[in-house]
């Protein structure tokens, strides 16, 4: 146990952690020199250059005449996946804090760092990409020292591209990170920090043993779900899974026990023996709650069952995705899906498209609201269609977040304007270094769901970084905004919005739909309504034939008769005609500026 070191890598998106991890693996001869990131398996991970799932890999390293086992647990850096990060951090004793020498400290770096400090991890700061022409190692070192309170000589300068500093990192891991502590005699207690789905073997859980020993064939149970299994195969994770007869305290490994559904394996759960269970679970387990909800509908109605099967398969690998069936008058049958955030939603959509060849329509994303009726009962509503009658509602509460934005001082003005427009309240701001500032806001989650991140990036020329945590619910004046076409509500376009924004949003939606819905043989009235009150209207004029073209001179009553006849025909057509809303209209309404 003395020769085991468990560590993870903390970094903001795109600060080069996966590339640096490759260099560590090559240096310890765990892998041959290869192309591309070893730890990012999914094509999507490689393409977007982000790490979505956590991964683990074991390296062997000789130092001072002794052999050490180093377990690297890779973590995602993106805000949507922060729960996966927290579980990975809990399985470690130390962390490499990687900061890009050309970009400096970013918002996600700080939030993940605080998480690591809460778990009392030993932090080794690493300055990456020092070989770049745009690197400013001295300035960024000062930022790290302000943040961590460490010394200059504690910071290792490295480059994932050239391999500089890799040996120093490995030495620091052995010297500075403490070995795992635990009692091999105690009952088994192991923390699950990830699970993957394998189509032949079922769900494979990755765990780290805190106390005790696990042997092949043991009967084990998972603490929070209470389910019992046989440990058919256990082992360690190198580039492939290597079976072992037993794993001891401090080891990181995997267990295969023929589990079929991902719901049974919850990240953060505790594994223990049935015969001799541990007293209590490892602290810090929480159910991951989806934050953003959207309707997902197949474009062809007959693909409904295929969509269900595809979502179920995705859920095997991605336990944070939730879905339940719902139907819409405009779009037919589909599912209400819950996601961790917007990036997660985009990734699920792309994976449906790529891995299952499913084309889907997604409705306006929204968050879940707490609706209190006059009797004081609370209902959680994920869908504007599920809102009770306004006369029965006492008040509505919506989820708020604590947002942290780090940006260059030049962009403070426009960013503050953006946050105020999204009903943000400034909590505080402080300067990280001479020209970078950290701004804290309290904001409603519903406002940032649609396009906040994109706007923030474009205002700040891509330099601002953003991170958020949920901070509970607050009462809000929310109303349900309906869009009517010729007096018929289109349920897929309904949204919940704040009273102050309702008029503006309704007007913009009507104008946008007017551009996108094709003209018909009759007038189409597009209206935005709150309850029975119409707040905005646009009319798409009918296409009409010039029926009086054949009249030369003659009496005006002849023309009038023809025009009246046309009018009657249009009126009859309007009663039986219906308006098709094209798919691009649904998408454009999502991206209103």
UniProtKB/Swiss-Prot annotation:
PROSITE patterns in UniProt: G_TR_2 (PS51722)
Listed GO biological process terms: positive regulation of translation
Keywords: Cell inner membrane, Cell membrane, GTP-binding, Hydrolase, Membrane, Nucleotide-binding, Protein biosynthesis
One Gene Ontology cellular component: plasma membrane
EC number of this enzyme: 3.6.5.n1
Catalytic reaction equation(s): GTP + H2O = GDP + phosphate + H(+)
HAMAP family, A to Z: LepA
Its job: Required for accurate and efficient protein synthesis under certain stress conditions. May act as a fidelity factor of the translation reaction, by catalyzing a one-codon backward translocation of tRNAs on improperly translocated ribosomes. Back-translocation proceeds from a post-translocation (POST) complex to a pre-translocation (PRE) complex, thus giving elongation factor G a second chance to translocate the tRNAs correctly. Binds to ribosomes in a GTP-dependent manner.
Name the UniProt record assigns to this protein: Elongation factor 4
Organism: Phocaeicola vulgatus (strain ATCC 8482 / DSM 1447 / JCM 5826 / CCUG 4940 / NBRC 14291 / NCTC 11154)
Taxonomic lineage: Bacteria, Pseudomonadati, Bacteroidota, Bacteroidia, Bacteroidales
